[in-house]
């Protein structure tokens, strides 16, 4: 288990969490040990994401850097976007989706690190995106005051909803039965079946991060030191606790045997791990904390779990016309992309093309056969 945090100071921090056995009369001990610091970006880090092998970081320098956590090396960099990278989401271990201030959303093949599809998603910035647990749909919000639904099977826009203000967070629930949209200090809860707001949660200050603890329980952090836990059905605040000495910037939750864990990162330079009780009305207990000495901006938790081959995005449409060629180096040097000529071969997100190859099209063969029969009839008449 590795806690990974990005900072305004352009540095990436990694801490390995060591779990000690519980002693008589004492709880199990969790100890974060500094593992690495890495300075590869030329501007502050804005977003992090992880799967079972990689951690990826997005920055205001418009690049995405890839880190192989099993080999502990920098794997490469992607330079497709022309604006601050604002959102990164893995779906399983085969695909990554990125969004940026250039208004584009890109789908990447993680095995080859190739851009399979580019959407012109918003007229303004893409501020956040979230993938449905099924992998068939994605939601995005941007600075054009729209909430957009994407059909990832066909690789196209499915629905556009106008909202009154610019939303900066959108997130699916773990089951995919509901989703939330955050505007300033308010969380609108939507039901998937009706696509309408079923209720609104109001926080004290502007919301900076949210994470679902269960299908109906949501942790909310704002521009303050407090984290609040809400019930999305009753809209009731179940509990709140002071997590940091400065505003909380990002949160991640996950489950391991015997523990449901919430991790928080703050401008005060601390990463903290909290264990959540079954009764969410009881505030969580602090497991451990790590001090970085930097102003933290984003957070992810890398869990060394076996790859799940079933988790992958369904097929999408054709690859982006400016298909990038990625040069990979394992030495830890920065790897840039070189744009190659457009690839004429059709592909899909799963990597298996179902399009007929040139010269073997059934339509072309049928036309050729009809032309041959017409030629024979013409010769008989002559």
Curated annotation (Swiss-Prot):
Keywords: Nucleus, Repeat, Ribosome biogenesis, Signal transduction inhibitor, WD repeat. InterPro entries: G-protein_beta_WD-40_rep, PAK1-Kinase_Regulator, WD40/YVTN_repeat-like_dom_sf, WD40_repeat_CS, WD40_repeat_dom_sf, WD40_rpt. One of its GO terms (biological process) is negative regulation of signal transduction. Its main location: nucleus. SUPFAM superfamilies: WD40 repeat-like. One of its GO terms (cellular component) is nucleolus. It is found in: Nucleus, Nucleolus. Residues 313-382 are annotated as: Disordered. The keyword Nucleus applies. Residues 365-382 have a biased composition (Basic residues). WD repeats lie at residues 37-77, 80-120, 122-160, 202-240, 243-284. The keyword Cytoplasm does not apply. Residues 352-363 have a biased composition (Polar residues). Interacts with PAK1. PANTHER family: P21-ACTIVATED PROTEIN KINASE-INTERACTING PROTEIN 1 (PTHR44675:SF1), PAK1 INTERACTING PROTEIN 1 (PTHR44675). Negatively regulates the PAK1 kinase. PAK1 is a member of the PAK kinase family, which has been shown to play a positive role in the regulation of signaling pathways involving MAPK8 and RELA. PAK1 exists as an inactive homodimer, which is activated by binding of small GTPases such as CDC42 to an N-terminal regulatory domain. PAK1IP1 also binds to the N-terminus of PAK1, and inhibits the specific activation of PAK1 by CDC42. May be involved in ribosomal large subunit assembly. This is p21-activated protein kinase-interacting protein 1. It comes from Mus musculus.
């Amino acid at each position: 288990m590795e806690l990974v945090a990005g900072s305004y100071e352009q540095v990436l921090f990694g801490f390995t969490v060591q779990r000690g056995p519980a002693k008589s009369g004492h709880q199990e001990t969790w100890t974060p040990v500094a593992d690495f610091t890495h300075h590869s970006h030329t501007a502050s880090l804005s977003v992090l994401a992880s799967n079972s092998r990689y951690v990826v970081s997005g920055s205001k320098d418009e690049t995405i850097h890839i880190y192989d956590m099993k080999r502990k090396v920098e794997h490469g960099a992607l330079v497709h976007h022309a604006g601050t990278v604002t959102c990164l989401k893995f779906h399983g271990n085969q695909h990554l989706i990125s969004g940026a201030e250039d208004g584009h959303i890109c789908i990447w093949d993680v095995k080859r690190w190739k851009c399979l599809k580019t959407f012109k998603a918003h007229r303004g910035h893409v501020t956040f995106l979230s993938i449905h647990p099924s992998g068939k749909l994605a939601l995005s919000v941007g600075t054009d005051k729209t909430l957009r639904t994407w059909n990832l099977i066909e690789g196209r826009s499915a629905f556009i909803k106008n909202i009154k203000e610019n939303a900066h967070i959108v997130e699916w629930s773990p089951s995919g039965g509901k989703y939330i949209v955050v505007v300033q200090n308010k969380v609108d809860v939507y039901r998937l079946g009706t696509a309408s707001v079923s209720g609104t949660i109001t926080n004290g200050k502007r919301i900076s991060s949210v994470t679902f603890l269960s299908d109906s329980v949501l942790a909310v952090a704002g521009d303050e030191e407090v984290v609040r836990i809400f019930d999305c059905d009753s809209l009731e605040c179940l509990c709140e606790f002071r997590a940091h000495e400065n505003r909380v910037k990002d949160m991640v939750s996950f489950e391991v045997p015997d523990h449901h864990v919430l991790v928080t990162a703050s401008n005060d330079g601390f990463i903290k791990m909290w264990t959540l009780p079954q009764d969410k009305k009881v505030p969580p207990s602090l497991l451990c904390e790590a001090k970085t000495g930097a102003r933290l901006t984003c957070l992810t938790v890398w869990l060394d779990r076996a790859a799940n081959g079933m988790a992958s995005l369904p097929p999408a449409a054709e690859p982006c016309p400016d298909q990038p060629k990625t040069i990979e180096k394992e030495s830890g040097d920065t790897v840039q992309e070189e744009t190659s000529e457009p690839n004429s071969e059709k592909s899909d997100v799963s990597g298996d093309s179902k399009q007929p190859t040139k010269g073997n099209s059934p339509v072309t063969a049928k036309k050729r056969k009809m032309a041959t029969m017409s030629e024979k009839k013409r010769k008989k008449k002559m």
